[in-house]
Design a protein with these regions (language model features):
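Nucleotide donor/acceptor-binding cores
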Residues: 1, 73, 130-132
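Terminal peptide-recognition signature
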Residues: 3, 34, 88, 117, ...
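Short N-terminal binding/cap micro-motifs at the start of the first secondary-structure element
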Residues: 10-17, 27, 41-43, 85
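Extracytoplasmic/periplasmic beta-strand context in beta-sandwich domains
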Residues: 18, 86-88, 131
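Glycine-rich beta-strand-centered segment in the early N-terminal region that forms part
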Residues: 21-39, 48-82, 89
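Extended, non-globular alpha-helical segments
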Residues: 32-36, 94-124
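Mid-domain Rossmann-like dinucleotide-binding core that forms the NAD(H)/NADP(H) cofactor-binding site
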Residues: 108-110, 114-155
């Protein structure tokens, strides 16, 4: 399979287009043929090894993907790394079904920010329909989605 891989940390100049062996899923895992991979803040920092968790080389970046399983299901998943490849192995329990009305661009691009915004608005904030709320940094990916989720919830 084709993949973007880093042998040394850096920006886009460190990306190498390589051939790798197809990954093999183990028990409780599923192979996902990647159709889209999101690019977010964590991805750009993981390639420089200056984010939360120390990265190991060689590294195939890409934390959020959309794609198809061998049985034809459309899924999205947060994978940590490996999304910049044609195929990635994902724990079955971490796959999210993608409904027909959501395309793969939307599923992969909104996964990390969308789950974060949903958790903030639905689980942490107390939203009372009709009341106003303030969302700091509403111009960013997570903030923009948080505004939309809060509005749909009645704020």
């Amino acid at each position: 399979m084709k993949a973007i891989q880093l042998q040394e940390f850096g920006g886009a100049e460190a990306f190498q287009y390589v051939d790798l062996e197809d990954p093999t899923p183990g028990d409780g895992e599923v192979l996902v043929e990647v159709t889209r991979c999101g690019v977010n803040f964590a991805d750009t920092h993981s390639t420089r090894n200056d984010y939360l968790a120390e990265q190991q080389l060689p590294l195939v970046p890409g934390a959020e993907v959309a794609g198809r399983t061998p049985d034809g299901r459309r899924v999205a998943a947060l994978v940590g790394s490996g999304g910049y490849a044609e195929k990635v192995v994902v724990p079955e329990s971490l796959t999210i079904p993608v409904p027909d009305e959501v395309d793969d661009d939307q599923a992969a691009g909104a996964l990390d920010h969308g789950l974060t915004a949903m958790a903030l608005v639905k689980r942490i904030a107390v939203i009372v329909p009709g009341e106003s709320i303030a969302i700091e940094a509403a111009a960013g990916g997570t903030g923009t989605l948080a505004v939309q989720i809060a509005k749909a919830a009645g704020s």
